[in-house]
Amino acid sequence: MTVVSVSMPESLLDRLDEFAEEHGYTGRSEVVREASRNLLGEFEDKKLEGRELMGVVTVVFDHETSSAEERMMQIRHDHEHTVVSNVHNHVGDHYCMELFILEGELDEISTFVGKVRATSDILSVDYSVVPLDDFEADLAH
């Protein structure tokens, strides 16, 4: 197996070590491998390809030390055909939370999430997607 080096804040490394211990992992490498597989597989679900999806993306960043807010606005404008709605909230003393409601196909949503994740100074990105046609069967009854 190839050995790699990864840079991360000490606080994140501490959390990673605690997580590994609490959940019975043999070490941080096992946690990072599993997380990497999960991240890479997120948008590779063949059941979602070619289907119209709705998605929610939640982004958290420190508004005092980053230009992330400006970048979020730029990404939103670049994907205005996919972004149905966007809410910006102040959370705590230093943080902003952006909530994006998306509608589109898998490749459009994954491109949007990828650009958000690639933005420097982002503290957290979370999302979920649901196929719109999942509700058609419920409405037919």
Curated annotation (Swiss-Prot):
Keywords: DNA-binding, Metal-binding, Nickel, Transcription, Transcription regulation
Xref: Pfam families: NikR_C (PF08753), RHH_1 (PF01402)
Cofactor, free-text remark: Binds 1 nickel ion per subunit.
Residue sites binding Ni(2+) per the record: H77, H88, H90, C96
Cofactor(s) annotated in UniProt: Ni(2+)
Signal peptide start-end: none
GO annotation, biological process: response to nickel cation
Keyword Transcription: yes
The keyword Protease belongs to this UniProt entry's keyword annotation: no
A single MF term (Gene Ontology): nickel cation binding
InterPro entries: Acetolactate_synth/TF_NikR_C, ACT-like_dom_sf, Arc_rbn_hlx_hlx, CopG, CopG/NikR_regulator, Ni_resp_reg_NikR, Ribbon_hlx_hlx, TF_NikR_Ni-bd_C
Family named by the database record: Belongs to the transcriptional regulatory CopG/NikR family.
Record's function text: Transcriptional regulator.
Protein name, UniProt field: Putative nickel-responsive regulator
UniProt organism field: Natronomonas pharaonis (strain ATCC 35678 / DSM 2160 / CIP 103997 / JCM 8858 / NBRC 14720 / NCIMB 2260 / Gabara)
